[in-house]
Structure formats: C-alpha cells, structure tokens
Regions:
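Short acidic/polar active-site loop segments enriched in Thr and Asp
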Residues: 49, 111, 134
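Conserved acetyl-CoA-binding loop-helix of GNAT-fold acetyltransferases
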Residues: 84, 90-103, 130
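Conserved active-site alpha-helix within GNAT-family acetyltransferase domains
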Residues: 95, 119-138, 142
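Conserved GNAT acetyl-CoA-binding A-motif
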Residues: 105-117
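Residue-level recognition of the GNAT/N-acetyltransferase active site
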Residues: 68, 85, 118
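Acetyl-CoA-dependent GNAT
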Residues: 2-74, 99, 143-145
Length: 150
C-alpha cells in the first residue's frame, strides 16, 4: 500500500471537495462540503495548507498544518489535522503524512514542530510518542458565547 500512495498539497476546489469524507472521520461535526470548504478557505488566509495522501485516485489521508511564530517556540509548524481513513489505520500512512508535514517545517526553517491531541486519545498519544514528539504542556479551552463576551 505505501508504495502506491502519493502525498501532495491540495490546491484545487475539486480536490478539497474530495477530501471532505476523510476529514469528516476526524472532525465529525463538519456538516457538509460547502461549510468545510468555506472553513478551509478562511484558514488558508492564515497560512493553512492541506497535504493529501492519494491512492488509486482517492484521498485516503490528510495532514493540515500552518506556519506560526510565537514567543514560546519561535517559528514553527503547527499540525491542526492528521487523519487516515479507518480502513488504513496501522498501515504506516499516518507516519508518512506526519513526516511530510515535518519536512515542510524543515523547509520553512522552523525551530519546532507542534500539535495537540485530546487527553482521551491514548492511541494517538502513543503514535505521537513513537514519532518522536514529546508532551510539553496542556491545552486549555473555554467555549465563548456572545453573552460571555459582552
């Protein structure tokens, strides 16, 4: 399987639309292709890029990332999304996608390669440790409503 997979950036709207079903496996709250496309378009204005793994003309995995800069890490690539279609879990494809994103970070002369995963996702955490990533902190989130911001 691995030798038949090509990893390349999604550049066209047609390819973005074709990626929806795979992204929905990771982000089940995504309601439809149009909403997904609009969200990716907004994220692209902030530097978001989407790598796709193609096999036999179909997208079977995705890695979404963006270049960032902050006082903690300096210049770094942040991985927003990493997903491999369920039928290809444990095939090595996740490792290949993560490596492709890491290579982008190196090419962009980044000092760090960063991602988050849910505390409830033990298998993902084990995968990231095996890929050489280390847990360096916790990510805190507060959902905001309009009432809370006024």
């Amino acid at each position: 399987m691995q030798s038949q997979v090509e990893i390349k950036h999604i550049e066209s709207d047609t390819d973005l639309e074709a990626s929806f079903s795979v992204m929905k496996e990771l982000r089940p709250h995504l309601s439809d292709r149009a909403t997904y496309g609009a969200q990716v378009a907004r994220q692209r204005t902030q530097g978001y890029r989407l790598l796709a793994a193609w096999s036999d003309g179909a997208i079977v995995g995705l890695a979404g990332y963006r270049l960032q800069d902050n006082l903690i890490y300096g210049r770094f690539v942040y991985v927003d999304d990493l997903v491999v279609t369920a039928s290809l879990h444990r095939s090595g494809l996740g490792e290949r996608l993560l490596q492709a994103a890491r290579q982008q970070a190196v090419a962009l002369r980044c000092k760090h390669f960063v991602l988050d995963t849910g505390l409830h996702m033990a298998l993902a955490q084990r995968f990231y440790f095996r890929q050489g990533l280390l847990a360096k902190g916790m990510h805190f989130v507060e959902p905001l409503t309009q009432e809370a911001t006024t």
